[in-house]
Amino acid sequence: MVPAWLWLLCVSVPQALPKAQPAELSVEVPENYGGNFPLYLTKLPLPREGAEGQIVLSGDSGKATEGPFAMDPDSGFLLVTRALDREEQAEYQLQVTLEMQDGHVLWGPQPVLVHVKDENDQVPHFSQAIYRARLSRGTRPGIPFLFLEASDRDEPGTANSDLRFHILSQAPAQPSPDMFQLEPRLGALALSPKGSTSLDHALERTYQLLVQVKDMGDQASGHQATATVEVSIIESTWVSLEPIHLAENLKVLYPHHMAQVHWSGGDVHYHLESHPPGPFEVNAEGNLYVTRELDREAQAEYLLQVRAQNSHGEDYAAPLELHVLVMDENDNVPICPPRDPTVSIPELSPPGTEVTRLSAEDADAPGSPNSHVVYQLLSPEPEDGVEGRAFQVDPTSGSVTLGVLPLRAGQNILLLVLAMDLAGAEGGFSSTCEVEVAVTDINDHAPEFITSQIGPISLPEDVEPGTLVAMLTAIDADLEPAFRLMDFAIERGDTEGTFGLDWEPDSGHVRLRLCKNLSYEAAPSHEVVVVVQSVAKLVGPGPGPGATATVTVLVERVMPPPKLDQESYEASVPISAPAGSFLLTIQPSDPISRTLRFSLVNDSEGWLCIEKFSGEVHTAQSLQGAQPGDTYTVLVEAQDTDEPRLSASAPLVIHFLKAPPAPALTLAPVPSQYLCTPRQDHGLIVSGPSKDPDLASGHGPYSFTLGPNPTVQRDWRLQTLNGSHAYLTLALHWVEPREHIIPVVVSHNAQMWQLLVRVIVCRCNVEGQCMRKVGRMKGMPTKLSAVGILVGTLVAIGIFLILIFTHWTMSRKKDPDQPADSVPLKATV
């Protein structure tokens, strides 16, 4: 038993699947069929098992049709019931189905296309019975000036609707019966070549043409119709126009009318072409317009071609040419040329040398004032108080030349030149042109030394070759590095090649070096003259005095360093030795040939001192703090007095001894002597006790020091001469004149003596002799007696003068009338 679900699936699947669409059937029925009806057209492939169904014939919309078609249910034929008119309907779209009473489709739909076959049952018709046309003289032959229109309702594309046009007659037939030609297929009426030549001689008249249209193409049979064409011959108005001048930047309402053309013939269409393309247009009446402002600088002239054409775009005649000239106005600024790279001008170029030539472009009309450009130099301006300028500009040519003011190398000058149109007149435009000028350097400066005299330079004769003697520096005022390259040479003063030069190629510094050994005996001095010159060729005046420099070299004699008689020295001293105690004498190994100056180094305690020239070493102070058995080391340095740089040194070791028992200080009187104050250049010799047999206990040497009294040490100075004598002088410039007793301590080994030196300090005369104060001499007047004598003498003189004047007065009273010169003088007693 089959399941219910499987049976339902089998039933529903065929209904769900789409049915195949039957192919369309095409049936042709002749138009205006004259036979019996109904006319069986075709048998449809109906199914056999569909006898129970109903055949339904419908139109292309699916609705049942009541037209001239029907279905024979018995035979299954499609039939037409009456004649069909193709011009009424050319095709019928039908579909046939087999349906149940409830509308269920058992078969179909079957599409059927019924085409009505055309037959020549229509007569062609002209669109007009009478055509009127105007023909202008000058129309080209073969160019249609009238198109005849005719129609045929038969099926298009068949011979039934294939029309042909013909001219049947022309009236009048003069001057030629074939004045016109008619294109058979298009119906285009044109002037024939013969008519074109005859038309010029023909009078202005109207021609009537009888034209025919026939269907069936070129077959002899067919339907036909006729019409009349009236052609009026008129004079040509297609004449050239004068050039049109339009101002650029014209401020009017656009489009702006500028001209008009006219083709006197009929059916004309105007076409405008602009060369180059421009803002122009033409309307149907032949009016020419400009549609916007013109720019002469963009396009100065246009060539317009206006064509008169028929409806098919064919020219009736040659196109008219119209020249449109754009008139210039001053609406453009002079444009300076692009700024070139910097223009280089050598310094010292003569006046009039052309620097550059400016050529400003003005886009206005060439040759007109609008484009007439002149030039004016704006910068640099003339300097105050200076005549002339460094640059000049020719106003017409724009040539920039050098002026009378000189230029300096290294200058970078920006020239500002004003370019003006309208020849500089008021109201014109202007631009500022820039020209950068660089003044290049030339080799017009000779190098010179900054110092012409160097030295004297001292060199020891043992200096090594290669030693730098001097560094010379030369400068060159030129700016170009190639012009600053220098060559150096020794011009004179070095015949033996003792010296040499070395320098860097791009440097102005040259080193004078020693090449050979110096010899003081051969040449104690040298004067080396060094010359400098430019490597590049010099322009202008040659080198001056500064191109040479003189180096003076002094050769120093080399002295061997001094040498002491010992490599080291030692001395012993009791720790109780007083200041000034003699220790030892430092001597050179060759004391005759050179003089040395001695000094102590590293005397940190300050216990010792050394005589500069004698080399005697003494204690400078008491040896406080020294212990017996200790040593004290200092360095003795000896310098050559003539060559301080030459020196020698040796260590001095002092051994401290135990102090011996202090002996009694013995006073030894010394005879008095005198010294002058203010101090003069002499002193007193103090002898040691060795000359006094009572004080001497042995032979020298002795050491001499002043006593410990601070006043004595301030006022007096004691200098040891040798081992037995000392020299006493004043330490101050002024010491009170009187007798002074100076204690001098003399020591020898462990013994000490004190000498009392009596010194009379006095004023001295010019001969250095002492002037002493003396007492009152016997019989010498006193001061009081001297004053009394002086007063008595003065009183006696006064009394005597009074007596003389009294006597003279009395003598004048005795003889008053006698002249004074007649009175004899009286002798006076």
Curated annotation (Swiss-Prot):
Membrane topology: Single-pass type I membrane protein
CDD domains: Cadherin_repeat
Biological processes, Gene Ontology terms: calcium-dependent cell-cell adhesion via plasma membrane cell adhesion molecules; cell adhesion; homophilic cell adhesion via plasma membrane adhesion molecules
Tissue distribution of the protein: Kidney specific.
Pfam family of the protein (one): Cadherin
Record bears the keyword Oxidoreductase: no
GO annotations of cellular component type: basolateral plasma membrane; extracellular exosome; plasma membrane
InterPro entries per the UniProt record, alphabetical: Cadherin, Cadherin-like_dom, Cadherin-like_sf, Cadherin_CS
Domain of life: Eukaryota
Chief place of localization: membrane
Chain segments annotated as transmembrane: 787-807
Compartments, record wording: Cell membrane
Region (Ectodomain G): 666-786
Signal peptide coordinates: 1-18
Domain Cadherin span(s) in chain numbering: 25-126, 131-235, 242-336, 341-449, 455-564, 569-665
Record comment regarding domains: Three calcium ions are usually bound at the interface of each cadherin domain and rigidify the connections, imparting a strong curvature to the full-length ectodomain.
Summary of the function given for this chain in its UniProt record: Cadherins are calcium-dependent cell adhesion proteins. They preferentially interact with themselves in a homophilic manner in connecting cells; cadherins may thus contribute to the sorting of heterogeneous cell types.
Protein name: Cadherin-16
Gene from which this protein is expressed: CDH16
